[in-house]
């Protein structure tokens, strides 16, 4: 039956890409994009839109792609999304828009993410920019953090005529998009920098190297700098560890540090002096997308890489596409296993891991079956580098320097889901700073929600 399978997307061959940092997925060309768009049934009650956290008008943009009207398709997408070239690459479409596509009932869903990426890339290559607000409305808003939540909130507010300034702690804008996601999944200069420039083209100002809570506080921004509202999108950058013996050894990294050195500080390039030690044999602890990113990065730096995860393959939280790519590239999965100790040599360097085998017991609070240790099953894995990918928490610097800002026991800022409003008047928050580490698109959705909340707040002030 015609249209059951999607147009294949071109990729680098596994044996080639495992030795370079070029983008794995090569995307659609114009002919392929039009052919894939023609698979869309243009449903009147489009379920795909219900799966999109930023509410892109998916049938409308795909209808324009069908006709070859790529510029119009871009403007439809950019009405809702500030980062389409990013989302088309890293969003978990399989559980969101594509997961609700009617085509998926009797075949493969329409490749919505790949079409979004194509449109955004086409627009960038042809110099097409999002439409700017005609005039300012006289209100100043500060945005803390230039990650997906901050960029989205700032972009949406700028479109409504607000005078928006983003304050970024690092020397480069992009947040987790530049320090957390590898080049082979999300090119920095070609894609992320261009998306940031598009947000700036809307009139948003970005000040880098400004640590809010240290250089200036939120109270000072509002009381002395004239900002009438503040959005906190500072992310969750503090890594978690297991608390097992040997974690302080040299050769133990958090995935956050390992990826930041490579992605932001370009440790993988010979013309940069950023120190990194991938070693010959790397153990990555964890099973999420960040673990896959760390493992695939270490592989490209020449190491044999093992992913050690305490549950089975069905329970891996990483996207299936990322797991598939990791396996293709030769990453070894040691599943239903968990480290109990990091082994250290006499000089203080990692020499291996002691690991215990696990089995799945009863479901835990998340609905997943709890891993249970199998007594007497411990053994040792040789390794000279261990990368811990166990999630991250928000940095308490902002919350500890802002009077009246409530946080929960996990140090996450408490914000209303419907508006992004916090306990402090005029201060809004969203993304990982509120939820803990989550996806790019969920952070964008939170930034979008907060922009609406801020707009309503200032209109009624």
Feature names for model-found ranges:
Residues 42-67, 86-119, 165, 172, ...:
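Iron-sulfur cluster-binding cysteine motifs and their immediate structural context
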Residues 119-135, 194-211, 239-301, 408-418, ...:
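Glycine-rich dinucleotide-binding loop and its adjacent helix/turn
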Residues 433-459:
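A conserved FAD-binding loop/helix module that cradles the flavin
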